[in-house]
Amino acid sequence: MKRLILTLLSTAAAVTLAAQPDSLDYRGDYYFSKRSQQESLPVRPHHTVMLGNSLTERGAWAEYFPEAHVINRGIGGDCVAGMAARLDSIVAGRPRAIFLMAGVNDLIFSTIAPEALLRQYERLLDRIAAESPATQVFI
């Protein structure tokens, strides 16, 4: 009986691990709702953008730093690919600075290799540098 239970648990664990994606599917209703809401308030050159996941979204950044003209672009559950997908509306405003909190959900909830995640992260940083070169980026 113990052997049967161990076999069933091992099989369930293997199936669960095999089903984890290499990258997260960030495109749920919540993501699109938050993205739409955020994009309705355009980024301006005097803004400091907080870009990230739920850790960013839940921060009261504008209250903490009122003189910095902070706008919060955090979306709970977001991943590097999701941030890259919404980067156009951010860099179009040529913000003064971007604080980036990215990769946490990728590492916790997907099986993406650290090297692949690093390449996604580098592409995100390269796009910011190319499309908004005067923007300071803080990681």
Specify the residue positions occupied by each region the protein language model found.
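Acidic-enriched, low-complexity/disordered segments with a strong bias for Aspartate over Glutamate
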Residues: 22-25, 29, 78, 88, ...
